[in-house]
């Protein structure tokens, strides 16, 4: 069984974990077009998900939350990305569950008390998978919390479906 975590933000990620070997099969920074404004690369998202077999995969999609301090475009893009990914999953007949950030964070990150869930997910994934490179690209200096959040969601997915 494969377990997939999807952080659907523009700076999110998609991580696929093999349930038998407990290893990371693939990880992808959320595909986007960058220009004056960042937009989702819907074709690339479809390509990432196209090889998944509906009978052998469980997916967790993070519920979109709009922050009160977000601007109009940020709020729109949050909902847009959430809807686009739900549409792709439905069109491909892939089984998925929607989870709130609080649910997966409380389960996977319990015992980590930095007060910053992004740092906690980076620390958790770096410890759990020390050989994985959590940067968005080889040139990146910072670790990508969208990837680590997606990994945590994939591990949460395994817990709720077992």
For the regions a protein language model found, what residue spans apply to each?
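Phosphate- and other anionic-substrate recognition elements at nucleic-acid/protein interfaces
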Residues: 1-162
């Amino acid at each position: 069984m494969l377990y997939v975590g999807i952080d659907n933000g523009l700076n999110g990620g998609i991580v696929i974990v093999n349930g038998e070997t407990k290893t990371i099969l693939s990880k992808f920074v959320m595909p986007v077009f960058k220009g004056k404004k960042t937009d989702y690369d819907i074709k690339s998202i479809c390509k990432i998900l196209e090889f998944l077999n509906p009978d052998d995969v469980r997916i967790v999609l993070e519920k979109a939350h709009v922050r009160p301090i977000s601007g109009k475009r940020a709020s729109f893009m949050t909902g847009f990305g959430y809807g686009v990914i739900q549409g792709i999953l439905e069109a491909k007949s892939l089984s998925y569950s929607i989870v709130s950030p609080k649910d997966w964070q409380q389960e996977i990150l319990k015992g980590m008390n930095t007060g910053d869930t992004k740092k906690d997910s980076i620390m958790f994934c770096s410890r759990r998978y020390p050989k994985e490179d959590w940067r968005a690209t080889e040139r990146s200096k910072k670790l990508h919390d969208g990837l680590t959040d997606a990994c945590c969601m994939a591990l949460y997915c395994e817990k709720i479906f077992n």
